[in-house]
Protein backbone atom coordinates (compact mmCIF):
# COMPACT_ATOMS: atom_id res chain seq x y z
CA UNK A 1 0.00 0.00 0.00
CA UNK A 2 1.13 3.58 -0.54
CA UNK A 3 4.87 3.62 -1.21
CA UNK A 4 5.39 -0.01 -0.33
CA UNK A 5 5.70 -3.28 -2.23
CA UNK A 6 6.98 -6.78 -1.60
CA UNK A 7 10.63 -5.78 -1.92
CA UNK A 8 10.86 -2.27 -0.49
CA UNK A 9 8.66 0.06 1.51
CA UNK A 10 8.90 3.78 2.26
CA UNK A 11 6.30 3.31 5.00
CA UNK A 12 8.98 1.88 7.34
CA UNK A 13 10.98 4.83 8.63
CA UNK A 14 13.16 6.27 5.85
CA UNK A 15 12.51 3.16 3.79
CA UNK A 16 13.35 -0.48 4.35
CA UNK A 17 13.89 -3.75 2.50
CA UNK A 18 10.68 -5.74 2.95
CA UNK A 19 11.85 -9.16 1.74
CA UNK A 20 13.10 -10.17 5.19
CA UNK A 21 9.84 -9.18 6.87
CA UNK A 22 7.84 -10.95 4.18
CA UNK A 23 9.84 -14.19 4.45
CA UNK A 24 9.52 -14.25 8.26
CA UNK A 25 5.95 -13.06 8.83
CA UNK A 26 3.94 -13.29 5.63
CA UNK A 27 5.23 -16.05 3.33
CA UNK A 28 2.79 -18.72 4.51
CA UNK A 29 0.22 -19.33 1.73
CA UNK A 30 -2.47 -19.55 4.41
CA UNK A 31 -2.13 -15.80 4.87
CA UNK A 32 -3.86 -15.35 1.51
CA UNK A 33 -7.11 -16.19 3.29
CA UNK A 34 -7.12 -12.62 4.56
CA UNK A 35 -8.67 -11.70 1.20
CA UNK A 36 -11.92 -13.23 2.42
CA UNK A 37 -12.07 -11.27 5.69
CA UNK A 38 -12.91 -7.68 6.49
CA UNK A 39 -12.19 -8.00 10.21
CA UNK A 40 -8.51 -8.69 10.96
CA UNK A 41 -9.29 -10.05 14.42
CA UNK A 42 -11.67 -12.66 13.05
CA UNK A 43 -9.10 -13.59 10.42
CA UNK A 44 -6.38 -14.14 13.05
CA UNK A 45 -8.77 -16.29 15.11
CA UNK A 46 -9.78 -18.39 12.11
CA UNK A 47 -6.17 -18.72 10.93
CA UNK A 48 -5.03 -19.87 14.38
CA UNK A 49 -7.75 -22.52 14.54
CA UNK A 50 -6.99 -23.62 10.99
CA UNK A 51 -3.26 -23.99 11.62
CA UNK A 52 -3.82 -26.03 14.79
CA UNK A 53 -6.32 -28.23 12.93
CA UNK A 54 -3.87 -28.72 10.06
CA UNK A 55 -1.12 -29.57 12.56
CA UNK A 56 -3.34 -32.26 14.08
CA UNK A 57 -4.25 -33.54 10.61
CA UNK A 58 -0.59 -33.67 9.55
CA UNK A 59 0.35 -35.66 12.64
CA UNK A 60 -2.55 -38.05 11.99
CA UNK A 61 -1.34 -38.50 8.40
CA UNK A 62 2.15 -39.22 9.70
CA UNK A 63 0.96 -41.80 12.23
CA UNK A 64 -1.36 -43.47 9.71
CA UNK A 65 1.52 -44.00 7.28
CA UNK A 66 4.31 -44.59 9.80
CA UNK A 67 2.48 -46.83 12.27
CA UNK A 68 -0.09 -48.70 10.20
CA UNK A 69 -1.07 -51.02 13.05
CA UNK A 70 -2.50 -48.24 15.25
CA UNK A 71 -6.31 -48.07 15.33
CA UNK A 72 -7.87 -44.94 13.88
CA UNK A 73 -9.43 -43.92 17.20
CA UNK A 74 -6.02 -43.73 18.88
CA UNK A 75 -4.59 -41.81 15.94
CA UNK A 76 -7.37 -39.24 16.34
CA UNK A 77 -6.71 -38.95 20.07
CA UNK A 78 -2.94 -38.60 19.65
CA UNK A 79 -3.31 -36.16 16.77
CA UNK A 80 -5.63 -34.01 18.88
CA UNK A 81 -3.07 -34.06 21.69
CA UNK A 82 -0.42 -32.89 19.24
CA UNK A 83 -2.52 -30.08 17.82
CA UNK A 84 -3.63 -28.84 21.25
CA UNK A 85 -0.42 -29.37 23.23
CA UNK A 86 0.74 -26.63 25.57
CA UNK A 87 3.39 -25.45 23.09
CA UNK A 88 0.75 -24.84 20.43
CA UNK A 89 -1.44 -22.86 22.81
CA UNK A 90 1.41 -20.86 24.33
CA UNK A 91 2.83 -19.96 20.91
CA UNK A 92 -0.44 -19.03 19.24
CA UNK A 93 0.58 -15.38 19.58
CA UNK A 94 3.50 -16.21 17.24
CA UNK A 95 1.19 -17.24 14.44
CA UNK A 96 3.94 -17.53 11.84
CA UNK A 97 5.66 -20.23 13.92
CA UNK A 98 2.68 -22.58 13.83
CA UNK A 99 3.45 -23.60 10.24
CA UNK A 100 6.31 -25.66 11.65
CA UNK A 101 3.81 -27.77 13.60
CA UNK A 102 2.11 -28.59 10.31
CA UNK A 103 5.21 -29.39 8.31
CA UNK A 104 7.30 -31.22 10.93
CA UNK A 105 5.25 -34.47 10.85
CA UNK A 106 5.37 -34.38 7.05
CA UNK A 107 9.15 -33.94 7.08
CA UNK A 108 9.43 -36.91 9.45
CA UNK A 109 7.24 -38.98 7.15
CA UNK A 110 9.44 -37.97 4.23
CA UNK A 111 12.49 -39.21 6.14
CA UNK A 112 10.76 -42.52 6.88
CA UNK A 113 9.85 -42.99 3.21
CA UNK A 114 13.40 -42.15 2.16
CA UNK A 115 14.88 -44.77 4.48
CA UNK A 116 12.30 -47.53 4.12
CA UNK A 117 11.03 -47.01 0.56
CA UNK A 118 13.87 -45.07 -1.09
CA UNK A 119 11.39 -42.31 -2.01
CA UNK A 120 12.86 -38.82 -1.86
CA UNK A 121 10.13 -36.62 -3.35
CA UNK A 122 7.96 -36.28 -0.25
CA UNK A 123 10.90 -35.16 1.90
CA UNK A 124 12.08 -32.73 -0.78
CA UNK A 125 8.66 -31.06 -1.12
CA UNK A 126 8.06 -30.92 2.65
CA UNK A 127 11.39 -29.23 3.37
CA UNK A 128 11.00 -26.84 0.43
CA UNK A 129 7.53 -25.76 1.57
CA UNK A 130 8.73 -25.29 5.14
CA UNK A 131 11.65 -23.09 4.12
CA UNK A 132 9.40 -20.95 1.93
CA UNK A 133 6.71 -20.62 4.62
CA UNK A 134 9.08 -19.57 7.41
CA UNK A 135 12.85 -19.86 7.05
CA UNK A 136 13.44 -19.37 10.78
CA UNK A 137 11.35 -22.32 11.96
CA UNK A 138 12.54 -24.28 8.92
CA UNK A 139 16.05 -24.08 10.36
CA UNK A 140 14.86 -25.78 13.55
CA UNK A 141 12.84 -28.35 11.60
CA UNK A 142 15.92 -29.19 9.52
CA UNK A 143 18.01 -29.63 12.67
CA UNK A 144 15.38 -31.93 14.14
CA UNK A 145 15.21 -33.83 10.86
CA UNK A 146 18.87 -34.77 11.32
CA UNK A 147 18.10 -36.21 14.76
CA UNK A 148 15.03 -38.06 13.51
CA UNK A 149 16.84 -39.33 10.42
CA UNK A 150 19.54 -41.05 12.46
CA UNK A 151 16.91 -42.42 14.84
CA UNK A 152 15.02 -44.06 11.99
CA UNK A 153 18.25 -45.15 10.30
CA UNK A 154 19.68 -46.85 13.38
CA UNK A 155 16.34 -48.56 14.04
CA UNK A 156 16.85 -50.51 10.82
CA UNK A 157 19.17 -53.48 10.51
CA UNK A 158 20.49 -52.74 7.02
CA UNK A 159 23.88 -51.42 8.10
CA UNK A 160 25.36 -51.93 4.63
CA UNK A 161 23.07 -49.18 3.28
CA UNK A 162 23.83 -46.61 5.99
CA UNK A 163 26.32 -44.57 3.96
CA UNK A 164 24.20 -44.58 0.80
CA UNK A 165 21.10 -43.54 2.75
CA UNK A 166 22.97 -40.75 4.54
CA UNK A 167 24.18 -39.38 1.19
CA UNK A 168 20.65 -39.52 -0.26
CA UNK A 169 19.26 -37.70 2.78
CA UNK A 170 21.95 -35.03 2.66
CA UNK A 171 21.49 -34.40 -1.07
CA UNK A 172 17.70 -34.27 -0.76
CA UNK A 173 17.87 -31.72 2.07
CA UNK A 174 20.46 -29.66 0.20
CA UNK A 175 18.41 -29.63 -3.02
CA UNK A 176 15.28 -28.62 -1.09
CA UNK A 177 17.04 -25.68 0.53
CA UNK A 178 18.71 -24.68 -2.74
CA UNK A 179 15.34 -24.76 -4.50
CA UNK A 180 14.04 -22.17 -2.03
CA UNK A 181 16.90 -19.76 -2.78
CA UNK A 182 14.65 -17.51 -4.85
CA UNK A 183 13.25 -16.33 -1.50
CA UNK A 184 15.81 -17.55 1.02
CA UNK A 185 18.89 -15.97 -0.60
CA UNK A 186 17.63 -12.35 -0.60
CA UNK A 187 16.33 -12.92 2.92
CA UNK A 188 19.75 -14.12 4.10
CA UNK A 189 21.46 -11.17 2.43
CA UNK A 190 19.01 -8.80 4.10
CA UNK A 191 19.73 -10.36 7.50
CA UNK A 192 23.48 -10.10 7.03
CA UNK A 193 23.07 -6.37 6.50
CA UNK A 194 21.13 -5.83 9.70
CA UNK A 195 19.80 -7.90 12.58
CA UNK A 196 21.58 -11.06 11.49
CA UNK A 197 25.05 -9.66 12.19
CA UNK A 198 24.28 -8.64 15.77
CA UNK A 199 25.27 -11.20 18.36
CA UNK A 200 25.12 -11.29 22.12
CA UNK A 201 25.09 -15.06 22.27
CA UNK A 202 26.42 -16.65 25.44
CA UNK A 203 27.87 -20.16 25.18
CA UNK A 204 28.86 -20.38 28.84
CA UNK A 205 27.80 -23.83 30.10
CA UNK A 206 24.70 -23.65 32.26
CA UNK A 207 21.02 -24.55 32.42
CA UNK A 208 18.17 -22.18 31.76
CA UNK A 209 15.80 -23.92 34.18
CA UNK A 210 16.00 -26.38 37.04
CA UNK A 211 14.59 -29.88 37.37
CA UNK A 212 11.55 -28.58 39.26
CA UNK A 213 10.55 -26.28 36.41
CA UNK A 214 11.22 -29.06 33.92
CA UNK A 215 8.82 -31.41 35.71
CA UNK A 216 6.21 -28.65 35.88
CA UNK A 217 6.38 -28.41 32.11
CA UNK A 218 5.06 -31.97 31.87
CA UNK A 219 1.97 -31.11 33.90
CA UNK A 220 -1.34 -29.59 32.74
CA UNK A 221 -2.37 -26.07 33.63
CA UNK A 222 1.15 -24.58 33.58
CA UNK A 223 1.34 -21.25 31.77
CA UNK A 224 4.40 -19.67 30.21
CA UNK A 225 5.05 -16.53 32.24
CA UNK A 226 5.94 -13.77 29.84
CA UNK A 227 6.10 -10.02 30.25
CA UNK A 228 6.83 -7.68 27.38
CA UNK A 229 10.55 -7.21 26.93
CA UNK A 230 11.49 -10.02 29.31
CA UNK A 231 12.48 -13.64 28.85
CA UNK A 232 9.81 -16.31 29.16
CA UNK A 233 10.01 -18.60 32.14
CA UNK A 234 9.10 -22.25 32.08
CA UNK A 235 8.99 -24.89 29.38
CA UNK A 236 5.93 -26.18 27.55
CA UNK A 237 6.17 -29.99 27.32
CA UNK A 238 2.64 -31.11 28.22
CA UNK A 239 0.69 -32.69 25.37
CA UNK A 240 -1.88 -34.66 27.30
CA UNK A 241 -1.94 -37.09 30.21
CA UNK A 242 -2.80 -39.83 27.73
CA UNK A 243 0.49 -39.22 25.91
CA UNK A 244 2.44 -39.47 29.18
CA UNK A 245 0.74 -42.79 29.92
CA UNK A 246 1.50 -44.05 26.41
CA UNK A 247 5.14 -43.00 26.73
CA UNK A 248 5.50 -44.88 30.02
CA UNK A 249 3.77 -47.93 28.53
CA UNK A 250 6.12 -47.84 25.53
CA UNK A 251 9.27 -48.02 27.66
CA UNK A 252 7.74 -50.81 29.77
CA UNK A 253 6.62 -52.80 26.72
CA UNK A 254 8.37 -55.72 25.04
CA UNK A 255 9.36 -53.73 21.98
CA UNK A 256 12.92 -53.85 20.69
CA UNK A 257 15.44 -52.87 23.36
CA UNK A 258 17.55 -51.08 20.75
CA UNK A 259 14.57 -48.99 19.67
CA UNK A 260 13.73 -48.05 23.25
CA UNK A 261 17.34 -47.06 23.95
CA UNK A 262 17.41 -44.91 20.82
CA UNK A 263 14.09 -43.33 21.80
CA UNK A 264 15.41 -42.54 25.28
CA UNK A 265 18.56 -40.99 23.81
CA UNK A 266 16.54 -38.79 21.43
CA UNK A 267 14.19 -37.64 24.20
CA UNK A 268 17.11 -36.93 26.51
CA UNK A 269 18.90 -34.94 23.83
CA UNK A 270 15.79 -32.85 23.12
CA UNK A 271 15.25 -32.12 26.81
CA UNK A 272 18.89 -31.09 27.21
CA UNK A 273 18.59 -28.95 24.07
CA UNK A 274 15.68 -27.10 25.64
CA UNK A 275 17.45 -26.44 28.94
CA UNK A 276 21.23 -26.35 28.32
CA UNK A 277 22.05 -22.77 27.27
CA UNK A 278 24.73 -23.45 24.58
CA UNK A 279 22.56 -26.07 22.85
CA UNK A 280 19.50 -23.86 23.18
CA UNK A 281 21.36 -21.07 21.37
CA UNK A 282 22.34 -23.45 18.57
CA UNK A 283 18.67 -24.35 18.04
CA UNK A 284 17.80 -20.66 17.98
CA UNK A 285 20.16 -19.98 15.09
CA UNK A 286 23.35 -19.55 17.13
CA UNK A 287 21.75 -16.60 18.89
CA UNK A 288 20.22 -15.98 22.29
CA UNK A 289 16.43 -16.18 22.09
CA UNK A 290 14.69 -12.85 22.50
CA UNK A 291 11.80 -13.14 24.99
CA UNK A 292 10.37 -16.52 23.90
CA UNK A 293 12.91 -19.21 24.70
CA UNK A 294 12.63 -22.96 24.03
CA UNK A 295 11.10 -22.45 20.63
Write out the residue ranges for each language-model feature.
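Periplasmic/ER-lumenal interhelical loops and adjacent helix-loop junctions
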Residues: 1-7, 29, 165-263, 269, ...
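Membrane-interface coil-to-helix junctions
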Residues: 1-59, 80-101, 191-196, 203-231, ...
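Juxtamembrane loop-transmembrane helix junctions in multi-pass integral membrane proteins
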Residues: 38-42, 69-70, 94, 132, ...
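Short alpha-helical transmembrane interface motifs in multi-pass membrane proteins
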Residues: 40-44, 168, 266
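Alpha-helical transmembrane segments of polytopic membrane proteins
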Residues: 48, 97-100, 141, 232-240, ...
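Membrane-embedded helix bundles of polyisoprenyl
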Residues: 53-65, 72-154, 168-188, 193
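Transmembrane helix-loop junctions at the membrane interface of multipass transporters and ion channels
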Residues: 129-131, 284-291
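Membrane-interfacial, low-structure loops and terminal tails that flank and connect transmembrane helices
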Residues: 158-165
